[in-house]
A protein has these predicted regions:
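Helix C-cap/helix->beta junction micro-motif
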Residues: 70, 134-135, 163
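Conserved core segment of the aminotransferase class I/II
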Residues: 161-233
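Hydrophobic residues in well-ordered beta-strands that form the structural core
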Residues: 55, 76, 139-141, 169
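Active-site phosphate-binding strand-loop segment of PLP-dependent enzymes
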Residues: 81-154
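Conserved PLP-anchoring active-site segment centered on the Schiff-base-forming lysine
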Residues: 45-67
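Phosphate-binding glycine-rich loop
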Residues: 3-52
């Protein structure tokens, strides 16, 4: 749906080597021109005009800007600090349960967060996955800075490959290679099989309409993947 078969298979092999969950299906990967484009696709996929997404504060102003272009609101949840940064799960529960919470279609996690550098901790992850499942919302995990470990808590792990709830994990070369001009991003879709199948049917339509990845760029992906580990040491 997004690039050459060989390009997707190489990405799957790379993701298998860099996540705790083996067996990435090449068909679960969507290659795009950037992770910014990935946000746009996912908001189109998950939201109608007037819906909302949850996004962290501090976080990217870009998320609100892209959501606004899709006529979607951003509801902020505040990260808290008690010596280290953490997600206030009670606040997430309140935002999803209060009047207007039914408009929320996705929760954005930035793992690790920019600008705080804080990772999603294992206990937070478990509760957030349960919360998203209970409220029928998707999880968008932005992991472009994952390999830059400023807060090495035990149990730091990618959300890519999460099976407990419909999850869209974002990554890309511009951060992985420390090269802002290397504008290639991707989405990895995971979660319960039925939810993934339905999401991919719809995401395929978006991918086929935009056709963001040319073979000229895809042919360079193997070399970029090989260069990635050295760039983040």
């Amino acid at each position: 749906p997004a690039a050459s078969e060989g390009g997707n298979e190489r990405h799957a092999a790379f993701n298998n080597a860099n996540t705790a969950i083996e067996g990435v299906d090449p068909d679960a990967l969507y290659l795009l021109s950037s992770t910014s484009e990935a946000y746009s696709w996912l908001i189109k996929l998950l939201c109608d005009a007037g819906d909302a997404v949850l996004a962290p504060k501090p976080g990217y102003p870009l998320i609100e800007s892209i959501a606004r272009l899709e006529c979607v609101d951003t509801v902020e949840y505040q990260l808290q600090f008690d010596g280290s940064w953490f997600i206030d799960i009670a606040e997430l529960e309140r935002l999803l349960s209060e009047p207007g919470g039914e408009r929320i279609r996705a929760l954005v996690l930035i793992n690790p967060n920019n600008p705080t550098g804080s990772y999603v901790k294992p206990t937070e992850r478990a509760r957030i996955v349960t919360l998203c499942r209970e409220h029928g919302i998707a999880l968008i995990a932005d992991e472009v800075f994952f390999d830059y470990s400023l807060e090495p808590f035990p149990g730091n792990a990618r959300l890519a490959g999460e099976r407990g709830v419909l999850t869209f994990a974002l990554d890309g070369f511009s951060k992985m290679l420390a090269a802002p001009h290397a504008k290639v991003g991707w989405i990895q879709v995971s979660g319960p099989a039925e939810d993934v199948a339905e999401a991919q049917r719809r995401l395929d339509v978006i991918a086929d309409d935009y056709l963001p990845m040319s073979d000229i760029i895809a042919e360079r992906i193997p070399a970029l993947l090989n260069a990635a580990p050295a760039q983040t040491r």
